[in-house]
Design a protein with these regions (language model features):
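Conserved N-terminal/central alpha/beta ligand/cofactor-binding core
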Residues: 2-5, 13, 19-21, 45-46, ...
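Aromatic pocket-lining residues of Rossmann-like dinucleotide-binding sites
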Residues: 40
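N-terminal Rossmann-fold NAD(P) dinucleotide-binding loop
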Residues: 33
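Rossmann-like dinucleotide-binding core of oxidoreductases
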Residues: 205, 209-303
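Core beta-strand elements of the Rossmann-like FAD/NAD(P) dinucleotide-binding domain
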Residues: 20-22, 188-197
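Beta1/beta-strand and adjacent pyrophosphate-binding region of the FAD-binding site
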Residues: 16-30
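Short hydrophobic core segments
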Residues: 27, 193-203
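Conserved beta-strand-loop-beta-strand element in the redox core of flavoprotein oxidoreductases
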Residues: 173-192
């Protein structure tokens, strides 16, 4: 029961059922949360993985951020790049590739040359941090989001992780100075999940902030990405490289219509004829504000 006032509602104490107790509780089933849950389970821990949506993958799948990049330390003095994300990430990529759902350059193509740039830039496999052209090719992976969901689910199930979908994190359970569990909102009401170790993999620090951790608030460009089908990418790339000045004019015109975008605002995907559009850029929105996010959705859909 709740007590209603003019400007607020006073919620009275409630009895919340404990629906799971495990060694480890991971909140958020994006790439980080799935990897944390699988790793803990393989080390012999009982694990509960909590996700608010009906699928796994977070921004990688539902958010359609369709390139795994920033996975290397660039080599110096003619030494090759060091791939720093291996282990479970490598398992993901290998399984995606087995489903024809991941594409990345072989080591011999990871060099700085115009030939390789033309071959791999539209896959997003370039060092975006370098401004000089051609940018070096590096180990990055273009993937299909639905395949990512399938691979995530397979790995979680095989690892024996207890998965709780459709469970929206609500608040941390804190005893003394320790987080000992979480409360989630579900269609059946609020439920408690307890654990000896609780991992925040929400992406927005929801769990840690709820537990009282200090944080800083920043601002970044909001983007509503999308995909286009029926694109002849071979012809598009050929036109770009054979008619560079005309292509630049068209590209500038497109970006003005879109409302701001990265230089490589469209990229190829493992699905033939389908491109990923990482745009438009929409600065000034608060990612914590429901009203701000609604406004961003309207702008992203309608310009």
């Amino acid at each position: 029961m709740s007590e209603q006032h003019k400007d607020f509602v006073l919620s009275k104490s409630e009895q919340i059922p404990v629906v799971a107790r495990t060694d480890v509780v991971v909140v958020g089933a994006g790439p980080a949360g799935v990897s944390a849950a699988i790793s803990a389970a393989r080390l012999g821990c009982s694990v509960t993985l909590i996700e608010r949506y009906h699928h796994l993958g977070g921004q990688a799948s539902g958010g359609m951020v369709l390139v795994l990049d920033d996975m290397v330390n660039p080599g110096k003095d003619n030494r090759p790049d060091e791939i720093v994300t291996t282990g479970i990430v490598t398992e993901f990529v290998e399984r995606l590739q087995a489903q024809d759902s991941a594409i990345y350059p072989p080591p011999e193509d990871c060099v700085k040359s115009w030939e390789m740039w033309q071959k791999w830039s539209r896959w997003g496999c370039i060092n975006f941090h370098e401004t000089g052209m051609p940018q070096p090719i590096l180990h990055a992976v273009a993937f299909d989001p639905d395949a990512w969901k399938r691979v995530s689910l397979d790995l979680v199930r095989e690892s024996g992780v207890q998965l709780r979908l459709h469970s929206w994190f609500s608040e941390a359970i804190v005893e003394g100075s320790r987080v000992t569990g979480v409360i989630c909102q579900t269609k059946l009401g609020r439920q408690a999940i307890m654990g000896d170790m609780v991992v925040d993999a929400t992406g927005d620090l929801d769990l840690a902030a709820s537990a009282g951790a200090e944080y800083t608030k920043g601002e970044y460009i909001v983007t509503t990405v999308f995909r286009l089908a029926g694109v002849d990418t071979d012809r598009a790339e050929a036109y770009e490289y054979e008619n560079p000045e005309e292509y630049k004019k068209l590209d500038r015109q497109a970006r003005r219509i879109i409302g701001g975008a990265w230089g490589m605002w469209w990229l190829k995907t493992p699905l033939p004829g389908i491109v990923w559009c990482n745009c438009p850029h929409m600065p000034g929105y608060d990612g914590l504000s429901p009203e701000g996010m609604v406004a961003a959705e309207y702008q992203g859909a309608n310009g």
